[in-house]
Amino acid sequence: HIAGGSSVYEIINQYSALNTDENSNMPARDRRFDVTLLINGLPMIHIELKNKQHSYMDGFRQIKKYIGEGKFTGIFSAVQMFVISNGVNTKYFSAASDTELNEKFVSGWLDQENNPVSDYIDFAKSVLSIPQAHEMIARYTVLDKDAKRLILLRPYQIHAIEAVREASKNGKSGFIWHTTGSGKTLTSYKTTRNLLMDIPSIDKAIFLIDRKDLDTQTTMAFQAYANNDLIDVCLLYTSPSPRD
């Protein structure tokens, strides 16, 4: 039960994506997808597989080409997450246009002890089983309105948020330790958002900022994330310096 209801999960493979662009100057070319995971009838996670003699990045380049050819349109425009693997190396990244897909956003999976999960079977068990696959889409994606892009959280962010959620359910407190450039603002937003959505007894969350220069930056980021979400972000108070 994700997002308050029952869901139906399906897997399709070798789907034929036909060429439908009549205005294209390129020769008509049909494509065959490897594996697609459907949630409630909608394709949400697409997987491209290569053999061990090829780089997993061949899958990235193939997906980018398919997007440029218009193959991920119609119902396949619902795809949120791509997975690429050559069996021994497996990565994931969020959906985007072909011009915006960037190799730097390709991420591997890590377990809770920070050990890499590279084998495609182990990755499937950790990330693509149910309910994990649905949670990746429902809990750990963010649509950034200002940047106009979909963001998939990285493993360390997801594990931290899950730890906070489990602690909160048991009436405990805690903190998330992050370094500069690790996505602290995004992690803070998703931690707050998931607590509000998952635990009925939590009605409101207060986010404290101890540096004035981060005030506007954080507020704008939270509002950009929340614009297409189910929570509201309000700027309530700006406290004077304790010395005042």
What are the roles of these predicted feature ranges?
Residues 1-209, 213-229:
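ATP-dependent helicase/translocase motor core
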Residues 237-244:
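Conserved small/polar residues in nucleotide/adenosyl-binding loops
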